[in-house]
Amino acid sequence: MKTVYFKDPTKENIEAAAKIIRDGGLLAIPTETVYGLGADALNEDAVLRIFLAKGRPQDNPLIIHVPDSSWLARYCEDVPPEAYALAEKFWPGPLTMILPRKPIVPLRTTGGLETVGVRCPNHPITRAVIAAADVPIAAPSGNTSGRPSPTCIADMIEDMDGKIEGMFDGGPCAVGVESTIIDLTYTPPRLLRPGGLPLEALEAVLGHVDVDKAVVSLLKAGERPKAPGMKYRHYAPKAPVTVVTGDPEASARYIQAHLPEGAGVICFTEYKVLFPGRSIHDLGPAADKEEQARRVFDALREFDHEAVTEIYAQCPDTAGLGLAVANRLKKAAGFHVIEV
C-alpha cells in the first residue's frame, strides 16, 4: 500500500484526508498529545483495521475524537453536568471522558464495553478533518502496539508507512504524553490514566477524584480494561527498562553506582555529567515536568536505534504532570521499579 502524505492544512488536503476516513481508510492524525491512528469510529470494519495495523488486543478500547462538546450528546447517554463543565474548561485539550455509549457507537470501538471515551483534541488540523468527515474519529496512539508513542511524523513513518492510506504532518506534539482519562460513570469520578492534564486540575473542578489501581500497576489476566493503557505493557523500547525513583540526586547516584556495562541512561539534565561515555537521553530538568512529558517517548524510542543491553531511567515525583511521566516510564519498565 502506498501511503499519501499531507503537509499543508489547505482546504483540499483537509477534504482529501476526510475522504480517507469516510471511505473506511486509516489516517495518521496530529494532536497536541501524540500522533493518532484514526478511522471512522462508527465503521466496524475500519475500526478493526486499527487493531490489525497496530497489533492491538481487541479488548483494549479506543477513544473517539470529536470537534467540540456539542457532539457529546450524539454518542453518549445521560451526559452529566460535570462532563460539560470539564469540556468548557479543558476542551479542546488533553482530557478524555468516559461516559455511557449510545448504540450508534459499535462495541468493537469500545472494546466490548457499554462506555466510550471521548475527547476533543487541541489541534486545528485534526478538528478540521473530523468536521469535514462529519464522523467521530477513533484513534489510539499511532505506534505499533507496545512501542513508545509517536510524537512526530518521523515516528509515524517508522511504524506505519505502507500500512495505512494517509498521514497528516502537523508538526511535533506540544504535550508529548497521551490524554488524561477520567471515568465519570463512577462516584466519585475515577482517574484511569494520568496524562497531559494534571490530576490537580481535575480536582479543582470535580472535587476528590479516585485514582484507579491500574495507574500504579498492570491489570491482571481476566481483568477488562476500561480505558487504553490499563492492561497491557505499553510504551516499551526493545531493551528492558529499570526505573529508579526517589530524590533526584539519590536516584542519579544509585544509577551511577549500579549501571551495568552496555546499559543506557535516561536522566535529568543536571545529572548527565555523572555518565561520561554512556548512551544518555536527557529527560529535561528535574523541576520541569512539562519538558519531561515532551521528551519521555522520544527518549524511549531513540534507544531502539542504539546498541544498549538495558536502560536505567530516573523518574520524577508524581506532582502535576510528573504523575503521567512516571506512569509512562513505569509501564515501559513493566513496573520494574527500584525505590531509593
Question: What is the predicted function of each stretch?
Answer:
Residues M1-V340:
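Active-site-adjacent structural elements in enzyme catalytic cores
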